[in-house]
């Protein structure tokens, strides 16, 4: 294991990892309990840039962990999505103009599996979710200028959700994310957080 892998592997321990993160827009109510990060969203929080709506919002809750180059990050999310645009999942961020957020987002009366890739302006790619939206997993890998986003309904099988170009950089910030653009009070629980060097698995390897 080289120096980079040792440094990354040292971030894997759940309890120490939450404390090592740095908040962007820390929520008023949050706590760590038995390796679980629990929080309640503040009023009208969101991440979005320009497309369709014309506004820029950078007020969502994000607990970021800095990496050295490429990485794989994985987290389990529990939340009860009920109102329009309620959302929780994972975020990868280079700066306020370059980022990805992904997770469950409540839209048109149902929870959708969703991703937003922002490079100057945001896109939005929602889709139907066949699992239990109150309990799901996300995994994101960034390596050699490519971002691979996966989700899981059981923590075992990981279908591809998105494959996209993403800037090659010396470091990224990645971690749990949640927002409630239309309200406050969404309770979210994050657990089983893992951060490691890129897994390097074949694109069609769903393990």
Go through the PLM ranges and name each one.
Residues 1-207:
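Extracellular glycan-recognition regions
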């Amino acid at each position: 294991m080289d120096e980079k892998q040792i440094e990354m592997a040292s971030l894997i321990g759940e309890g120490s990892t939450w404390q090592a993160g740095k908040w962007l827009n820390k929520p008023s109510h949050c706590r760590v309990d038995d390796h679980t990060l629990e929080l309640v969203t503040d009023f009208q929080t969101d991440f979005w840039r320009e497309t369709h709506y014309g506004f820029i919002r950078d007020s969502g809750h994000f607990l970021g962990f800095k990496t050295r180059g490429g990485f794989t990050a994985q987290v389990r999310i529990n939340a009860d999505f009920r109102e329009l645009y309620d959302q929780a999942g994972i975020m990868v961020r280079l700066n306020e103009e370059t980022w990805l957020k992904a997770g469950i987002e409540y839209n048109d009366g149902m929870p959708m599996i969703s991703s937003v890739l922002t490079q100057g302006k945001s896109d939005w790619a929602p889709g139907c979710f066949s699992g239990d939206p109150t309990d799901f997993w996300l995994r994101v890998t960034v390596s050699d200028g490519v971002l691979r986003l996966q989700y899981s309904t059981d923590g075992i099988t990981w279908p591809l959700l998105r494959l996209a170009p993403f800037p090659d950089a010396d470091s990224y910030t990645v971690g749990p994310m949640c927002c409630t653009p239309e309200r406050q009070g969404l309770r979210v629980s994050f657990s089983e957080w893992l951060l490691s060097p890129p897994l390097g698995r074949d694109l069609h390897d769903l393990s």
